[in-house]
């Protein structure tokens, strides 16, 4: 870290990943603390495909108020209770260090300038808030040189965006709902590192990059208040599935992992449909993707792929690397090789696939047509690591905002 002077700009930069839940988080028992009604579990996706890059900086030369710039646009921090809560908690931890060691520079007293960029559309059902808040918390924690572990920091990230706590770790991550009123036991925990089951792959079918009709927070509140299915899901369905899918991950049992993933996605969207008024996140293209996955599994004679949908129409389809040609190759044959996204670090295995491995007559022809016309791009990815500290700063040594 730079030497202390009146004009010193302190900086730390990190990347953070997107995570896609296989056991869904939906509904809060305490909205102010972002405490969930049920536990959840996700796969952290590779940052070679999707990531948020965030630089946290502080300096006496900055204006008095903290600043946050997201994808080039200034954000109003003062109206975001979630962001304020994260920054307040991180400042308190830094202040404790400074109180214990008076020789440390008083970074907790300096205004922050935080600059963040996603390499994917924000608020389009790609879990941008999870990566965003995880990157913010990790970058500020690094700036402040905090000793807290990712598990401890996950309590803070949770207050920004519930699912952000899971993006502070790589691999397969559980968010334990906890029981305490203060939320101290509601935190993320690594179930298995990416290295335990590195063969996990995913293809994201991007249906629309438009902003969703019903924001997640609003949708959750409606479901909790009006869905009779919801209480049963939270109380009995999810706890059983959490235990079963954690065992499946430890055993690298894809068939069980896949069935639980698909059933839980269906269960989550059933509670949305059971809300009053009903909430529709999936559309005709989403349902065509569901039919395609079941048709591929049926044609192959075993479970080789699994769909899951968050609060949006995009399909995330999990499969193992050894089945890339069967799953992603069939999708490539349906959509055409010129569809945006059939490139990059996870594409090598598909380069020579020119025809569908699964005979297309075994796939619902209506689903094929809907997918052809309804998918704007794909994202090829796989299980990956947690946040990574980098030197690609978005703020210069003199405090100026840079482009990545």
Curated annotation (Swiss-Prot):
Metabolic or biological pathway: Isoprenoid biosynthesis; isopentenyl diphosphate biosynthesis via mevalonate pathway; isopentenyl diphosphate from (R)-mevalonate: step 3/3
Residues annotated for (R)-5-diphosphomevalonate binding in this entry: 25-28, 82, 161-166, 217
Keyword Nucleotide-binding: yes
Top EC class for this record: lyase
GO terms of biological process kind: ergosterol biosynthetic process; isopentenyl diphosphate biosynthetic process, mevalonate pathway
Entry's transmembrane regions: none
EC number, as in UniProt: 4.1.1.33
This protein's record includes keyword Lyase: yes
Catalytic activity: (R)-5-diphosphomevalonate + ATP = isopentenyl diphosphate + ADP + phosphate + CO2
InterPro entries, A to Z: GHMP_kinase_C_sf, Mev_decarb, Mev_diP_decarb, MVD-like_N, Mvd1_C, Ribosomal_Su5_D2-typ_SF, Ribsml_uS5_D2-typ_fold_subgr
GO cellular component: cytosol
GO molecular function: ATP binding; diphosphomevalonate decarboxylase activity
UniProtKB keywords: ATP-binding, Lipid biosynthesis, Lipid metabolism, Lyase, Nucleotide-binding, Steroid biosynthesis, Steroid metabolism, Sterol biosynthesis, Sterol metabolism
Highest taxon of source: Eukaryota
Pfam families per record: MDD_C, MVD-like_N
Record-stated family: Belongs to the diphosphomevalonate decarboxylase family.
Subunit architecture: Homodimer.
Described function: Diphosphomevalonate decarboxylase; part of the second module of ergosterol biosynthesis pathway that includes the middle steps of the pathway. Mvd1 converts diphosphomevalonate into isopentenyl diphosphate. The second module is carried out in the vacuole and involves the formation of farnesyl diphosphate, which is also an important intermediate in the biosynthesis of ubiquinone, dolichol, heme and prenylated proteins. Activity by the mevalonate kinase erg12 (AFUA_4G07780) first converts mevalonate into 5-phosphomevalonate.
Protein name per UniProt: Diphosphomevalonate decarboxylase mvd1
Organism whose genome encodes this protein: Aspergillus fumigatus (strain ATCC MYA-4609 / CBS 101355 / FGSC A1100 / Af293)
